[in-house]
């Protein structure tokens, strides 16, 4: 068996090339916050309500926009079709959503919360608002408004880095 290449590879010196300042690099901050919020939400929502954070995101969108197709869910929450489709199948199997084929276009489906799904949503949303309140408790009301405005502007500017023509 050939010797492991791990022992022969030397790490690059720390002072070679640029590095990120993780205290100032905005994409890292956003990613770290999102990951930690998502992981803790999944653990909490799963334990308390039997839904994970992806299921909750979809259910919350369906409460706002009942009867939408999966493509709309993908667009709004920024997930690929595969994970959304699998999540919807699980929600349907558990009786939380209803998926109906559009009679005018058999390729399109209308997705809505069932009564059971709406009841679950109505329990989870109370906890979601409480988590948001606790997260933002370190900010004044004015700072919260500024944060929301800045996040909205960043969201609207995502095309600057997600556009397929961007290198």
Each language-model region and where it sits:
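N-terminal leader segment of winged-helix/HTH proteins
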Residues: 1-49
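Charged, amphipathic alpha-helical coiled-coil/dimerization segments
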Residues: 4-9, 76, 89-152, 156
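N-terminal helix-turn-helix DNA-binding core of bacterial DNA-binding proteins
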Residues: 21, 35-83, 88, 163-167
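Active-site phosphate/pyrophosphate-handling residues
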Residues: 25, 57, 82, 134, ...
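Hydrophobic structural patches
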Residues: 30, 59-62, 151
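A short alpha/beta connector and helix-capping loop motif
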Residues: 155-163
């Amino acid at each position: 068996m050939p010797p492991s290449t791990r022992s022969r590879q030397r790490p690059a010196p720390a002072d070679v090339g640029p590095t990120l300042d993780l205290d100032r690099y905005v994409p890292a901050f956003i990613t770290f916050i999102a990951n930690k919020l998502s992981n803790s939400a999944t653990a909490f929502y799963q334990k308390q309500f039997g839904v994970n954070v992806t299921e909750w995101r979809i259910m919350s969108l369906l409460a706002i926009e009942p009867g939408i197709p999966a493509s709309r869910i993908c667009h709004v929450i920024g997930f690929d079709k595969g994970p959304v489709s699998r999540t919807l199948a699980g929600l349907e199997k558990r009786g939380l959503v209803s998926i109906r084929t559009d009679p005018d276009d058999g390729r399109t489906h209308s997705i809505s919360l069932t009564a059971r799904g709406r009841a679950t949503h109505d329990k989870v949303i109370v906890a979601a608002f409480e988590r948001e309140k606790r997260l933002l408790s370190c900010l004044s009301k004015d700072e919260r408004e500024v944060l929301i405005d800045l996040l909205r502007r960043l969201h609207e500017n995502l095309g600057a880095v997600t556009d397929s023509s961007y290198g």
